[in-house]
Amino acid sequence: EGRINYAQIEKVINTAMDAGSIGVKLLGGYYPFTPEETSNFIRAANEMTAYVAFHLGTTETGSRLDGLREIPSLLGANGRVHIAHINAYCRGSILPVEEEIIESLQILTDVRSQIVSEVHLARPNFTLGKCDPDGNVLADVCQNCLRLKGYATTADGLRSALMDGYASTVEETRTGLILVSGKRGVELFNEGNTDVQMSFPVNNSTSAFQLTVAKNSEDEFIIDAVGSDAGILPRNVNIEQCMQLVKFGGLEPLELVVKLSLNPAKMIGLENKGRLTEGNDGDLTIIDPIYGRAVYGVVAGRLVMIDGRVVGNGAKILTTQRGAAAVEETGIPYQVIDLTKAMMYAGR
């Protein structure tokens, strides 16, 4: 009683698609559905050829290794899904980190034909600190972060973690968003009545490295791409961290291109991006090989970054044919994509 049925799930996805969305994302670490509901969301999205991404976790599992273990049963024989930020489920909360990595890679290999996936490489994560009226932390992700260091999963536990420098919240400054802990962090937490963004240094460097470079017996990457995951926070370090992997020997330079450009484009069916080929969009990022950062950027033939400074403006909304009319009404430029060509449905 009070749960969501299949017809309601279809309505949710249809509404999103008609409004211009390319699909849906299930936030299992924050607003978990039952396993049956989660499976139904995936099935309904697949039947509509809608994109469906999944931050793991249901009412029976967490946003941890147990959530990944649940994937085969949620997908069944035919389900297709994008599993978000695999490294977030390998923080050592169930098994030692090394064992979680091995098991995760095996699960992903077993369902490879049904999933696409990525990792992010920043040490800090992103979560929400909101608490219920009794002071209990609501988000499973935030609870897990507190438990990792023995803090209570309460508002007071968050205040202690902020004072100790383990937790941070976000403050907007003239130069952008910054992570803040200590006394100022507690002040922001209290001013927001606990409903604030939180960050913890919980992403393990070992899992980030091993999950990024791992290959199967066919010499293919088990995990398709590297993503920023909430890049609005001061942790969009894809290029910098991947260049460290190149310097270390974990990735070849062209493999960096596969992880950061080619596969992300293929994942959502952007056939004109991800490679320098005649007839494709003229996109180019020039990286300083010494400092490992982007210094020049060209998008569709237009210079958008000079010496690391963004000089471009404007953007396009990606939508599907059924959402084009709604997006057109906004007056914002848009591009229609064909999700039958997305890696999730078209294969690798």
Residue locations for each model-derived region?
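Active-site beta-loop-alpha junctions enriched in small/polar residues
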Residues: 1, 27-31, 55-61, 86-89, ...
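Divalent-metal coordination cores built from histidine and acidic residues
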Residues: 1-28, 45, 49
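Active-site neighborhoods of metal-dependent hydrolases
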Residues: 13, 22, 87-89, 95-244, ...
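Active-site microenvironment of metallo-dependent hydrolases
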Residues: 14, 185, 189, 204, ...
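Active-site-adjacent beta->alpha loops and helix N-cap segments on the catalytic face
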Residues: 31-44, 63-67, 97-98
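Flexible loop/turn segments at secondary-structure boundaries
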Residues: 32-34, 60-62, 90-93, 124-129, ...
